[in-house]
Amino acid sequence: MAESEILNDVFTNGVIGPHTRMLGPVADGGRIKFLTTPGCWGPMITPTLRGGHEVNVPVAVEGARVGDAVVVRFESLKVLSKASSSGVDKPVEGAFVGDPYVAKRCPVCREPWPEFEVVGIGQEAVHCKRCGAPASPFRMVHGYTMLLDQARGFGVTVDAAKAAQVAERAAEYAQLPPKSRQVPVLVFGKGDMPGVAARVRPFLGQLGSTPAVNIPDSHNAGDFGYFLIDAPHPYSITKEQYERDLTDGHLDVDSVRPGSVLIVPVKVKGAGIYAGDAHAMQGDGEVAGHTTDVAAEAVVQVEVVKGLNLECPILLPPEEDLPPLAKPWREEEWEELKQYARELGLELEESAPLQVIGSGPTINEAAERGFARASKLLGMSVEEVKNRVTITGAVEIGRLPGIVQVSIQAPLRILEKLGLADIVIKHYRLPY
């Protein structure tokens, strides 16, 4: 029987797909409360995890079938960690097969996904239980430890001495959920950039639906997923699977935060809505490769849209996050526009803003894929999409190397046919 609200505090081993056992189902219109654990660095240095994240296991949604879509309304997000550590990575030679996020092994005894123990602090604190050698497949070339003051809304990076003190109490500062199995990266004790202040503006790097193929959770996107094509490890996929089965759940788009609406494709029965990889803050692009991963509590509300067969997520960000030309028309503006149109003898096209996600191995390929996806969704030529994006939208970088948001003012008559008009009108309080 479907539940009106589900608490999800259970995590994958780094792999997500049709094999992953789902919680639920949650009722159509119900809520999911996710207790998330940090993504990126903690899972990256944990030898037993088979992906670059440790996302929550998916939740089935009542009535969701392949070929439908699920509307995910992001209601709240609370940062739980007291500190975070991040930086630019460098893989350790010999500590992986093909992909250091996925196919980890001890660089000395060659044991795949070795059991481990943490001894002391520092970048070599994670040791293989079998032979005793340092076993993390990554080092942090330049990194920082940041203390977070959620009440005041900012964080400050600390010096090496304070970072070492935090490392000694890594579990306390990280506030990992009880069922998380990662090593908190705070044990590294990095303090290369002290005294830097940043505003806390949290969001989820992972929020979406389950892909139709079993893959590492961090690779459920068109950029990282590209590395799985014919890869030399058990999670290799074909180019056809790459193009067909991924759902772009790993966006790292900083507008996936409270007040946003994400509309995601259903590619397995029940949709399998999952979350993870919460960040305390991030500028467009996540140019360092990683940012301030934190444990968090997120609440979303879900609703099934029957027959809306999507290739990729559609994002309705908070209005203040929209680029200037994509912002919704307000009543006074619209009345003036109608008057001007009457003077010209024209009929105005009612429109609404939305963002189509583009993804690919490079940022240019991601943009082109975003245009193609928007073309298919809206039933217009790629050339028309490009013209509309140019004068009523924008292309924004979500993550390097290959996630973009293609903003466009889409004709309302088309959104009505898709079953999206009411959702967008209510979200942006449009004057139509």
Mark where each language-model region is.
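N-terminal, charged/glycine-rich beta-strand/loop interface patches
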Residues: 1-254, 265, 269, 329, ...
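Redox cofactor-anchoring modules in respiratory/redox and cofactor-processing assemblies
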Residues: 239-240, 267-356
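Short gly/pro-enriched beta-turn/loop segments at secondary-structure junctions
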Residues: 249, 256-260, 293-297
